[in-house]
Amino acid sequence: MTTQIRPFTTQSEALFARAQAVTPGGVNSPVRAFRSVGGTPRFIREAHGAYLTDMDGHRLLDYIGSWGPMILGHDHPAVREAVAAALDRGTSFGAPSEGEVRLAETVTRLTGVDRVRFVNSGTEATMSALRLARGFTGRTFIVKFRGNYHGHADGLLVEAGSGLMTNAAKTLGQAAPSSAGVPEEYARLTLVCEYNDPAALGALMQERGHDVAAVIFEPVVGNAGVLIPTPEFLAALHRVRDAGALLIADEVMTGFRLSLRGATGLLGLTPDLICWGKIIGGGLPVGAYGGRAEVMDFVSPQGPVYQAGTLSGNPLAMAAGLATLEVLESDPSIYARLETYTMQLAEGLRAAAQAAGVPLSVNQIGSMLTAFHQDAPVGSIRTYADAARSDTGAFAVWFQRMLAQGIYWAPSQFESIFVSAAHTDSDLNATLDAAHSAYAQLGGTA
């Protein structure tokens, strides 16, 4: 059974006040501020396995996993040992190292791409991939999908998901920038289509395909909540290359999470370029993009498309990423265990909400899950517009009641949660006990 955690958050409150004096909003990424759920964000002191400990000593069962990278759980021995060994050799060289070669060899072998280039974040990866696509094709326009989030490069902050979801929902149907500071001129170079609408994508490519350098997409959406592609939509994605456009899969979130070949391998997709992040750094800052040699050889110094980075291929990140992938590859049962746990979590959440009379629709694939607080049949939430109908107020109340019982869920209705290999059956039972209590209170049946 879960127990009510101590209500005080004195240390987090004090740190948040200090942070707001020196950092915009008191955080270094907006969703961490708890703006959509209320209350004080928890400042974390340490993390081990499936648990965080905040500055007030509260132990929290973690379903964020640093927003996806911690697929093995926090402080995994193999990752810790690899980083410690790398640290003994130095933190940054500004020169090539064996670690980046070994990780590149592993990524290419597991995913089937010919070449890979490491950068420092998912945003850098998608930004660089789009520049490469434009350089390779000689075209200007890109196509993205409403609610897909590809980082915060200007040209991609158009009808974006993630922390922009609430504001962007107000301009549904308009291809407008999702952030102040993004010039309309940039936004006009981004053509927006509805995710999971193959007819709309086909019509757009028929009309504008000759101008399109690339179509970028999340093979499984995670930042509008989890949205799973239909077979018809996947087929339409393959056809965009008939117009000479490149197909770019943003696997920053799904890469090595849904399978060793990511979502593209799981779904049978063969994009021209793939972007990665999160898991390939084992919890340290990283990004990468890769693809077939013909395209990747356009990247400097081999080709004319410039991209560089002082800390790209950082030896600590390379060591952590390589250790993570080695563990995943050495134990093929990990992915099956992750999926079983997450399916049971989804089923348990549905049952808890139903018992309390609370509307809930859960989307789940592999170890990714979103509990949409709305009345919709299972599997019917497939688009940005579908997700945007969720009751964010009900979610906020539920989130706080889960947090009060020591369950650390993503503090946004429009995010995926992530299950790790460190989660146990006992953790699952504790989570579902908490969910039954939270939904009973929300539905007035407690």
Curated annotation (Swiss-Prot):
Annotated metabolic or biological route of this protein: Porphyrin-containing compound metabolism; protoporphyrin-IX biosynthesis; 5-aminolevulinate from L-glutamyl-tRNA(Glu): step 2/2
One of the record's GO cellular component terms: cytoplasm
Listed GO biological process terms: protoporphyrinogen IX biosynthetic process
Cofactor dependence: pyridoxal 5'-phosphate
Keyword rRNA processing: no
UniProt xrefs under Pfam families: Aminotran_3
GO molecular function, one term: transaminase activity
EC number: 5.4.3.8
Membrane-crossing segments per the record: none
N6-(pyridoxal phosphate)lysine modifications at: 278
Record field: catalytic activity: (S)-4-amino-5-oxopentanoate = 5-aminolevulinate
Entry superkingdom: Bacteria
Keywords of this entry: Cytoplasm, Isomerase, Porphyrin biosynthesis, Pyridoxal phosphate
Complex formation: Homodimer.
PANTHER family for this protein: GLUTAMATE-1-SEMIALDEHYDE 2,1-AMINOMUTASE (PTHR43713), GLUTAMATE-1-SEMIALDEHYDE 2,1-AMINOMUTASE 1, CHLOROPLASTIC-RELATED (PTHR43713:SF3)
Cited HAMAP family: HemL_aminotrans_3
Protein family according to the UniProt entry: Belongs to the class-III pyridoxal-phosphate-dependent aminotransferase family. HemL subfamily.
Protein name: Glutamate-1-semialdehyde 2,1-aminomutase
